[in-house]
Amino acid sequence: MASCGIGSCAFAGGQISSLKPHTNQLLGVGAGVHGEARVTMRKATTKKLTASASTSPWYGPDRVLYLGPFSGEPPSYLTGEFPGDYGWDTAGLSADPENFAKNRELEVIHCRWAMLGALGCVFPELLARNGVKFGEAVWFKAGAQIFSEGGLDYLGNPSLVHAQSILAIWACQVILMGAVEGYRIAGGPLGEVTDPIYPGGSFDPLGLAEDPEAFAELKVKEIKNGRLAMFSMFGFFVQAIVTGKGPIENLADHLADPVNNNAWAYATNFVPGK
């Protein structure tokens, strides 16, 4: 569902100098403190895209806007230099450059988690409906298995990961994800600070960022698919609360009886707690 996932554009770009300033320019003078370096990098987001990206219909002043020819003039601070900029900001959230840089990073990271999450919600349930055995395939019920007597077997196989302690799982998540996030934000083993959104290097094993034009397009695909995935996850949350079923089962019910299984029918008959 995401044409640009975690292993591709998600962490690519560490070596593409044509699309981002040199590391020393991003760091400014005091790169010794990670926090100061990161703030300096955020201020560096006012750098313009090079010609390779500006020729794309997704970048620059002539880019595609959110309502096409009926969009009107976008705000002056939305110049089309970043992927996913369709010239829409009615709340003025991007008016401050530093807030804009921070929100851009937050959006991209949430997009990546949403793409992984949406896949994780749908795929196990889809496999279970096609004969693959799972302890519990529905995404919002699966985690509770760790509190059962038998614990939680990843992919239904006890020889892979047999989890029995929620504290151990929590500790592993903190350590492993903390290490990855630390690398993404503060750089590699030598301490070189890279772009925290597209760190490249070890995060781009397929070398997808080597072509600047293709990389610029992958960034757009990532943000578009990621925004769709965030809406999908919101829909999955609502479905779980209202119907108590997973997304695949809800889809099957709707296709079997679209008149009685749709958003309007559930909204008009929904009673919280029942």
Curated annotation (Swiss-Prot):
User: Transit peptide span?
Assistant: 1-41
UniProt-annotated binding residues for chlorophyll a 3: 145, 155, 222
Specify the superkingdom: Eukaryota
Carrying N2-acetylarginine, the residues are 42
Location of the protein in the cell: Plastid, Chloroplast thylakoid membrane
Amino acids binding chlorophyll a 4: 225
Residues bound to chlorophyll b 3: 165, 181
What's the record's note on cofactor binding?
Binds at least 14 chlorophylls (8 Chl-a and 6 Chl-b) and carotenoids such as lutein and neoxanthin.
Q: Which residues bind chlorophyll a 5?
A: 221, 239
Residues reported to bind chlorophyll a 2: 110
> Which InterPro entries does the protein's record reference?
Chloro_AB-bd_pln, Chloroa_b-bind
Reported modifications of this chain? Photoregulated by reversible phosphorylation of its threonine residues.
Binding positions for chlorophyll b 5 per the UniProt entry:
173, 270
GO molecular function ontology, one term from the record: metal ion binding
Q: Which residues take part in binding chlorophyll a 1?
A: 88, 94, 107, 227
Identify the residues that bind chlorophyll b 2: 112, 161, 190
PANTHER family in the record, alphabetically? CHLOROPHYLL A/B BINDING PROTEIN (PTHR21649)
Main function:
The light-harvesting complex (LHC) functions as a light receptor, it captures and delivers excitation energy to photosystems with which it is closely associated.
Spell out the protein name for this chain: Chlorophyll a-b binding protein type 2 member 1B, chloroplastic
